[in-house]
Amino acid sequence: MRAIRVRTGPGAFQYQIVEGLTPGVARNKLKAMFRDFVTAIKGTGGLILIKTTPGNAAGVASLIDRMNEPKVLGTVAGDDTILVVVDGEDQRADVQREFQNLL
């Protein structure tokens, strides 16, 4: 079972199941999580580094994967850092801009 931590109010969080999410629903959840947890986005080459608040990288990365974005090959998440591998350096700026627009 896959679960992610989501904000339910000021200082309040709960875990929600992410199995079976459509890309549209995943995008809405991802936007909320970016606003709540992402602190920085930087890119170089075909890689994007996303910094989150501690303990939230895995949940954000899981939703990025569920977006089924063809330009994104995959993600690797630690505690507060996500590495997004993009399909080619030329695609990175587009994907990074999409992530910035979620903030």
Predicted segment positions?
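N-terminal helix-turn-helix
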Residues: 1-5
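Non-DNA-binding regulatory cores of transcription-related proteins
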Residues: 23-96, 100-102
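Minor-groove-contacting beta-hairpin "wing" of winged helix-turn-helix DNA-binding domains
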Residues: 11-18
